[in-house]
């Protein structure tokens, strides 16, 4: 095992949060090392690249929307329901518009082109949209609806990748050092203080490094769409890493843990989220809970680990929201214009995770006509299934 030189700050995890922490530390004059078990980006790079921001951002104003920190707070406190302190929510709302300015300084780009319809994700014609429950009952009773979903300007589903690359470029331009394929397995603790980390890494000169990168890229794409195949490809990459990884350690004045969740850890899912074991994971294989466990090993506290979510969005096309969602008993699930995750949670909690959307012929025809203008290719594929074999038709509700 070789002992590396010390850094002011070591960050474990190089997604959007880790990159932001690295940038702030570098701006403060710190010497920064970032370790990531992948090649950087994490779930942030796979995401839609949407930042939730409000309180009067330039892009809200460009779209003719009125918002304020108080209005944003009145909405968000309904969403978090006490799981985040009022003080933290208030601070987030008050600094939200400033966050967009900060992101733009790092290279992120936004537009005030507002999507005029409810959608799970906007097309390339729109980069601002109602990304939550802002317009839905009962949320709109306490806060004036305002669109706050700011999507990074990029083509199709590349917004998340473009968003992270802007942060990566900014961090590396400020002198932040990055060591990929590095798995931290222990924190170095002396006299009750964390003073470094121990990790294994596959160095750039290691045999099979380029093949590992190719396999990881394929596994990352398949892991969310066809998990069994993605797992097999990842197993090959994992074998390469295990055969070539070497032990290292590094000391630091401060250690920041910035890893993902645990959706790719079957044991943790079974322990904390019974009933979700068979849900297809959304994220990367790095979301295995290892960084959470590192924090716990140093005395960190965790809470709400049982709060896993599974989604079924009903739009686009937006006309589908004019239908009625019902559970197996025929009872209505909830108002259809709720955010997809919110509506799905009610369906899980009260209807066993099963539901149906009932439409008449007029809504069906209207929705079909909206497919071309309201969908990106991945949404179009789902609509193609729905409008071909993914539905049942009858003259009456009785069938």
Report residues per predicted region.
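Glycine-rich active-site loop/strand segments that organize a redox cofactor
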Residues: 52-92
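N-terminal Rossmann-like FAD-binding beta1-loop-alpha1 element of flavoenzymes
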Residues: 9-34
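Conserved Rossmann-like nucleotide-cofactor binding loop
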Residues: 17, 40, 331
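A short alpha-helix-loop-beta-strand transition element characteristic
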Residues: 44, 83-88, 107-119, 301-309, ...
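An anion/pyrophosphate-binding glycine-rich loop and adjacent beta-alpha core
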Residues: 292, 301-399
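Conserved redox-cofactor binding core of oxidoreductases
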Residues: 93-246, 266-267
């Amino acid at each position: 095992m070789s002992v590396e030189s010390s850094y002011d700050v070591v960050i474990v995890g190089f997604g959007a949060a880790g990159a932001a922490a690295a940038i702030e530390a570098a701006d403060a004059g710190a010497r920064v090392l970032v370790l990531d078990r992948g090649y950087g980006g994490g779930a942030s790079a796979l995401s839609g690249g949407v930042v939730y921001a409000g309180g009067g951002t330039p892009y809200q104003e460009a779209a003719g929307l009125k918002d304020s920190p108080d209005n944003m707070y009145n909405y968000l406190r309904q969403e978090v329901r006490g799981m985040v302190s009022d003080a933290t929510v208030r601070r987030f709302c008050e600094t939200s518009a400033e966050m967009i300015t900060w992101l733009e300084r790092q290279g992120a780009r936004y537009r005030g082109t507002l999507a005029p319809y409810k959608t799970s994700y906007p097309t390339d014609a729109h980069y601002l949209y109602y990304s939550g429950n802002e317009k839905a009952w009962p949320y709109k009773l306490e806060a004036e609806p305002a669109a706050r979903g700011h999507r990074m300007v990029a083509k199709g589903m590349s917004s998340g990748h473009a968003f992270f690359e802007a942060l990566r470029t900014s961090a590396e331009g400020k002198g932040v050092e990055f060591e990929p394929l590095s798995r931290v397995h222990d924190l170095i603790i002396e006299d009750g203080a964390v003073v470094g980390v121990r990790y294994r890494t596959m160095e750039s000169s290691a045999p099979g490094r380029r093949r590992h990168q190719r396999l990881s890229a394929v596994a990352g794409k398949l892991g969310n769409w066809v998990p069994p195949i993605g797992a097999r490809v990842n197993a090959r990459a994992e074998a390469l890493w295990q055969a070539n990884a070497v032990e290292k350690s590094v000391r630091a004045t401060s250690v920041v843990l910035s890893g993902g969740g645990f959706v790719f850890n079957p044991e943790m899912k079974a322990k904390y989220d019974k009933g979700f074991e068979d849900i297809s994971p959304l994220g990367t294989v790095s979301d295995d809970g290892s960084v959470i466990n590192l924090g716990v090993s140093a005395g960190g506290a965790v809470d709400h680990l049982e709060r896993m979510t599974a989604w079924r969005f009903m739009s686009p096309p937006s006309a589908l929201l004019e239908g009625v969602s019902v559970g197996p008993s025929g009872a209505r699930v909830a108002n259809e214009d709720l955010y997809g995750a919110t509506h799905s949670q009610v369906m899980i909690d009260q209807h066993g995770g099963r539901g149906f959307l009932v439409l008449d012929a007029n809504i069906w025809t209207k929705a079909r006509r909206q497919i071309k203008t309201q969908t990106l290719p991945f949404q179009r594929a789902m609509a193609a299934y729905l409008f071909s074999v993914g539905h049942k038709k009858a003259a009456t509700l009785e069938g």
